[in-house]
Each structure stands twice: as structure tokens, then as C-alpha cells.
């Protein structure tokens, strides 16, 4: 009888490679539906807002560019970030920011949306943020350090803006009392 041949069993098929992890989805920017916003301002407030709005109208058309919306909002006492302004505008491109114009009736729901935002920092939040830079624990921060922070972190300010903001705030040692500074900023 012939010797038995070793019959090799076919190798098991290699395990399929794991499916690649799906690319992380970009967090969806929730759009603000301005048409659904209920205007809660009094007639007197609306008249005041319109008066301020028209001060920014450079052409006499009773319209402002999208790039001016943040300035008007801030002039009216709100403190939205640039990101919040862009969000309420529908995230327009830089070209649209300078080219597109809106009327007061389009601006009012934006003002209401920003006013409804409860996440805006208050006096204590700003003081607490600056206290981090108070190395001596004496209520002051170095003017040079504050300039650097304002120009390089978060929503970066231009050097001219920083200088205008800090004008008259430093003492003879180059230090700034940050509680007085925050009061000054919030009153402007």
C-alpha cells in the first residue's frame, strides 16, 4: 500500500481588515433661524436701536454691511465674539461680509438673538480671567503681558486696538489694576 500523502488543508482566509474608522464628522453648526426669533424689545428700544443702526449707514440707503453688524451690536451694549456675530449672520464669506448689506428689519432679529445669549461673560468672569496673570497677588498685571495676551490669544486684537484699549491704564511701573481695567472696559 502506498504511503499516505500529507494532504494540507487550505489555509484559512485571512481575516478581513477592520473597516477604517469613519472620518470624524465636523460638528454641525446649528443655524440660527432668524425668522423664528420673537422680538421682545419695546418700541422705544427698537427706536434707539434703529437710531444707532443708522449712524453706521455710510451710503444713506438705511443699510449697513455685514462687517458692521458686530460694531453696531457692541455699540448697543452687547459683547458678542466675532464667532457669535458670524454665526448669527449665517457664516458669510469675507467677500460677503464687505459686499452684502442688510436693513434694520433684518438686523433686529440678530440683536435679539445676541441679547438672548446668556453665555456672555460678566465682570467677575473677566476679573477671574485676568487674575491668572497676577503673579504677585496684588490686583495688578504687567501691561506688557496683557498687551501680548490681547494680541496673540483668543480673538486676537490689532496692535492699535490694544494700545487704544490700554491707553491711560498703566501706572508708573507699567502695571495695570485689572479690576479697574475691567470696569473701564465694561463702561465703554
From Swiss-Prot:
<dbReference type="GO" id="GO:0016459">
    <property type="term" value="C:myosin complex"/>
</dbReference>
<dbReference type="GO" id="GO:0005509">
    <property type="term" value="F:calcium ion binding"/>
</dbReference>
<feature type="domain" description="EF-hand 3">
    <location>
        <begin position="156"/>
        <end position="188"/>
    </location>
</feature>
<feature type="modified residue" description="Phosphoserine">
    <location>
        <position position="93"/>
    </location>
</feature>
<feature type="modified residue" description="N,N,N-trimethylalanine">
    <location>
        <position position="2"/>
    </location>
</feature>
<keyword id="KW-0505">Motor protein</keyword>
<keyword id="KW-0518">Myosin</keyword>
<feature type="domain" description="EF-hand 1">
    <location>
        <begin position="44"/>
        <end position="79"/>
    </location>
</feature>
<feature type="modified residue" description="Phosphothreonine">
    <location>
        <position position="65"/>
    </location>
</feature>
<keyword id="KW-0597">Phosphoprotein</keyword>
<feature type="compositionally biased region" description="Pro residues">
    <location>
        <begin position="13"/>
        <end position="25"/>
    </location>
</feature>
<comment type="function">
    <text>Non-regulatory myosin light chain required for proper formation and/or maintenance of myofibers, and thus appropriate muscle function.</text>
</comment>
<protein>
    <recommendedName>
        <fullName>Myosin light chain 1/3, skeletal muscle isoform</fullName>
    </recommendedName>
</protein>
<dbReference type="GO" id="GO:0006936">
    <property type="term" value="P:muscle contraction"/>
</dbReference>
<dbReference type="InterPro" id="IPR002048">
    <property type="entry name" value="EF_hand_dom"/>
</dbReference>
<keyword id="KW-0007">Acetylation</keyword>
<feature type="region of interest" description="Disordered">
    <location>
        <begin position="1"/>
        <end position="30"/>
    </location>
</feature>
<feature type="domain" description="EF-hand 2">
    <location>
        <begin position="121"/>
        <end position="156"/>
    </location>
</feature>
<dbReference type="InterPro" id="IPR050230">
    <property type="entry name" value="CALM/Myosin/TropC-like"/>
</dbReference>
<comment type="subunit">
    <text>Myosin is a hexamer of 2 heavy chains and 4 light chains. Does not bind calcium.</text>
</comment>
<feature type="modified residue" description="Phosphothreonine">
    <location>
        <position position="81"/>
    </location>
</feature>
<keyword id="KW-0677">Repeat</keyword>
<keyword id="KW-0488">Methylation</keyword>
<dbReference type="InterPro" id="IPR011992">
    <property type="entry name" value="EF-hand-dom_pair"/>
</dbReference>
<dbReference type="GO" id="GO:0030016">
    <property type="term" value="C:myofibril"/>
</dbReference>
<feature type="modified residue" description="Phosphoserine">
    <location>
        <position position="67"/>
    </location>
</feature>
<dbReference type="GO" id="GO:0008307">
    <property type="term" value="F:structural constituent of muscle"/>
</dbReference>
<keyword id="KW-0514">Muscle protein</keyword>
